[in-house]
A protein has these predicted regions:
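Active-site phosphate/pyrophosphate-binding segments
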Residues: 327-453
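A glycine-rich phosphate-binding loop feature that marks nucleotide/adenosyl-phosphate handling sites
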Residues: 170, 311-315, 367, 410-421, ...
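N-terminal export/assembly segments and adjacent metallocofactor-ligating motifs
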Residues: 2-304, 331, 459, 480, ...
């Protein structure tokens, strides 16, 4: 049913303001319907409603965007009356062309008015008056706040050097004039800062993909998905994590063109509900085992593309091993059990995965006999103890079946698109960071705790010859627009102890809109405005060839300022104001400059500045025959080699072999039992696996405090009826979930949409401990580990064992 066919709902949407009741009803009505109607031209969209609102009074409809890190970048329309946002709609007033689809927002973006006008917005600068983490603050003036920040920056630089200053990883800004980039620019102009590499989203897949292909650009335009006949959605849930605006639309179009879609996931996700022909539940952390068993089927049943593995790949069998490793274990030998005595049969994999052997064999045959086919990996499966292995195994299966370099195929891995999925952008001129050192982003707490002891074995980069460790630990933390300082970091109880110790990080400054769990550890909090209260620009996540303008919709509320304006004030105290602002440019000056640059340099895409500004967004239209990743390599591997050391698809990686850590970093992808798993000692006390998915309630932790979203998508632990019955738990019961790292008490959602033995606690809820330190809101990071993965040194926050009981 189209939402436009419901007269009562239409009447509610016609109201000049959208009430909480209407939002909840609308979100419920569209929760499943959105999957059926997403990006389809729906009876003129909502444009008549916008016209009716504009005709009803002095209402201005201002095109803007949704600039948070959900995976999409959608268009919003802010309806403003007397300087107040009274309504949010989306991209519905232009043709919905399959080659240029509308950029429609989900309920997250449509609830944004409640964020702008939330009663708990920070209104003025704050100075800590109690212990770090206590949330005790007093209001101070902007002058006193920025003076304090500048004084501490100067003190730490003079005492320890610039490498003691750290601009924390953060993704809450989303706009060119907001977020961590504004702080990084400030600190780089101030002489530099300790850098970081990797991120919390895809550390393992970023590192593992190039070990096979030599590049991260292994994907192609989403339009090419329409050429596929089979799509394996392996831990991939675009309906909730988005993975680029309109990704659901392209999967739907592929299905309409005849593709079969199979979701392999512990959860019966929204994607499984609306986009899949079949759901295969699988135990978390065992995806590599199922893939290995599929490879066994391909090998033993003669379904290997022999030409591909012989011509384009390295290390499949003993006849195609690299020089110097002729006697090393080949991939085929591992799969057949010739080297370890354990054939990776479907029956072997069933014991680990919980997937019936017959099902594994059937999926292996389908993938081996249906061409072209896609194996699309989601990123949750690589945020695990040995996340690099599932990425590499997922890249090998396309090689075994010859699904690389052909229309409708998919090389897998991180899959940044080659051609057809980018739009020209603009931003601040880059500034060199004079500090050469960087650390893995997920190990920042180690750099606070023991930075002066961290060396190359800890992932430190940039050490000169003769330097063994960092010269100092982090002494000043600068966190702009992010909640990874505490809330989104692993093992929050350990993290808060480190942050609370003022002998370690001596000063912490935070730009924030709310008193988040991370902000509570700041010595000074600088209140930031939302992107609707300043100028900026956003665009292109992984997929989506779009650029969305973010004009100022309303004036900044209270005493808030943009992240850029805040950094400019500090720059003035540091004597680098002119350098930071390039002679005093405001956010609006930069905004106009970027528009002029884009429209001058890319007139064919954006048109002139006036037209681009009026429309508010622009998408590079898709071409009907988009480029295919690695097509030139397949056409001539000698003339167009890959950028791997061998120039081939490296099933066996000599670079990994040379690391000589075969138990954790094997040269060929292998299934490795995780350190927290049903087969580890932890399972005796904590028998349930736990995961934390992206949730429609929020964007990571952004929007967690928004009342409408809280009611529409309450935080609960999702538990299978079998596990609930065993524990005497019924729907809605308050339950305690715990392990050695921490505990929480939240309501239970008893549902067959998660497999037995697994519970799901949606990630991003704000850590809210009671007097006993038990979290009462459901922050999954009270249960997660800070231990990094072995190769990428990335986050492993999906690997945890827990127990659940009724309270």
């Amino acid at each position: 049913m189209s939402i436009h066919e419901d007269t009562n709902l239409l009447n509610q949407l016609n109201q000049a303001t959208l009430s909480r009741r209407s939002f909840l009803q609308w979100s419920a009505a569209t929760g499943a319907a959105a999957l059926l109607t997403s990006n389809v031209n729906l009876v003129n969209g909502l444009y008549p409603l916008e016209q009716a609102l504009a005709a009803a009074g002095d209402i201005q409809v201002i095109p803007t965007g949704c600039a948070h890190n959900c995976g999409g970048r959608c268009v919003l329309k802010a309806h403003v009356q007397d300087g107040i946002i009274i309504r949010i709609t989306s991209d519905t007033d232009r043709p919905d062309d399959p080659l240029d689809p509308q950029l429609r927002a989900c309920v997250r973006g449509r609830s944004y008015r409640r964020r702008v006008y939330a009663p708990d917005r920070l209104k003025s600068p704050l100075r800590r008056t109690g212990p770090r983490g206590s949330g005790l603050y007093e209001e101070i003036s902007w002058e006193e706040a920025v003076d304090t920040v500048a004084e501490n920056l100067i003190r730490v630089k003079e005492t320890y050097g610039n490498s003691a200053i750290y601009s924390h990883y953060a993704t809450g800004g989303g706009s060119t004039t907001a977020g961590s980039g504004t702080a990084a620019r400030l600190l780089d102009l101030f002489g530099g800062r300790l850098g970081y590499y990797n991120n919390y989203s895809w550390a393992c897949v970023q590192v593992a993909t190039p070990t096979v292909y030599g590049t991260q650009n292994t994907g192609q335009s989403r339009l090419d998905w329409l050429n596929s006949k089979l799509i394996l959605m392996w831990g991939w849930n675009p309906a909730e994590m988005i993975d680029g605006t309109n990704t659901m639309y392209f999967v739907k179009q592929a299905r309409a063109a005849g593709a079969k879609t199979i979701v392999i996931d512990p959860r019966h996700t929204m994607s499984a509900v609306g986009l899949a022909d079949e759901w295969i539940p699988i135990r978390p952390g065992t995806d590599t085992a199922m893939m290995a068993a599929m490879a066994y089927v391909l090998i033993t049943e003669g379904l290997i593309d022999e030409n591909f593995v012989n011509t384009y790949a390295l290390g499949f069998d003993a006849d195609h091993m690299p020089a110097g490793y002729e006697n090393a274990e080949s991939f085929k030998a591992y799969i057949l059990g010739e080297s370890d005595g354990v054939p990776k049969t479907p029956a072997w994999a069933e014991e680990y995965t919980g997937v019936p052997a017959d099902t594994i064999a059937r999926i292996g045959r389908e993938y081996g006999t249906t061409k072209p086919a896609m194996l699309y990996q989601g990123y949750g499966i690589q945020r695990r103890a040995y996340g690099e292995q599932v990425v590499r195994m997922g890249c090998v299966l396309p090689a075994l079946t010859g699904n690389i370099g052909i229309p409708g195929g998919w090389a897998s891995g991180i899959a940044f698109a080659i051609g057809g999925e980018s739009a020209p952008g603009a931003g601040f001129p880059s500034v060199a960071n004079a500090v050469p050192y960087s650390v893995p982003s997920y190990m920042y707490t180690d750099a606070v705790l023991r930075g002066a002891e961290m060396g190359r074995a800890d992932g430190v980069r940039g050490l000169a010859e003769g330097e063994e460790t960092l010269p100092t630990g982090i002494k000043l933390l600068y966190n702009a627009a992010g909640n990874c300082l505490a809330n989104q970091h692993g093992n929050i109880n350990r993290t808060k102890e480190i942050l609370a110790d003022e002998s370690l990080a001596e000063f912490i400054v935070v730009h924030e809109q709310f008193l988040t769990p991370s902000a509570k550890f700041a010595d000074i909090i600088l209140p930031a405005c939302t992107f609707m209260e300043t100028f900026g620009m956003t665009g292109n996540w992984k997929y989506g060839p779009s650029r969305v303008l973010l004009p100022k919709v309303i004036e900044p509320l209270y005493g808030t300022k943009s992240d850029y304006a805040i950094a400019a004030m500090i720059a003035e105290r540091l004597g680098i104001y002119d350098e930071y602002t390039e002679g005093g440019k405001t956010e609006e000056d930069w905004y106009n400059q970027w528009i002029q640059t884009l429209t001058t340099d890319n007139a064919a895409v954006y048109g002139d500045a006036e037209a681009f500004t009026a429309r508010g967004s622009m998408t590079v239209p898709y071409t009907e025959n988009p480029p295919v990743a690695f097509a030139d390599f397949i056409a001539d591997p000698v003339a167009n080699p890959l950028t791997t050391p061998s120039g081939l698809v490296e099933i066996f990686s000599p670079a990994l072999a040379a690391m000589n850590k075969p138990e954790e970093i094997p040269a060929i992808p292998k299934f490795i039992v995780e350190w927290d798993s049903p087969w580890s000692p932890e399972a005796e006390n904590y028998p349930l696996q736990a995961i934390g998915n992206h949730y429609m309630h929020r964007v990571h932790s952004t929007l967690d405090n928004i009342d409408w979203m809280d009611e529409a998508f309450p935080q609960r632990v999702f538990i299978n009826p079998a596990d609930a019955t065993e524990r005497g738990i019924q729907e809605g019961d308050m339950v305690r979930i715990w392990n050695d790292r921490g505990a929480m008490i939240i309501p239970a959602r008893v549902t067959p949409r998660i497999m037995p033995g697994v519970v799901n606690i949606p990630q991003g809820a704000w850590y809210t401990p009671d007097a006993d330190g038990v979290d009462r809101r459901g922050c999954v990071n009270v249960l997660t580990s800070e231990r990094p993965s072995p190769l990428a040194l990335g986050n492993t926050q999906q690997t945890m064992m827990v127990q659940v009981e009724k309270v």
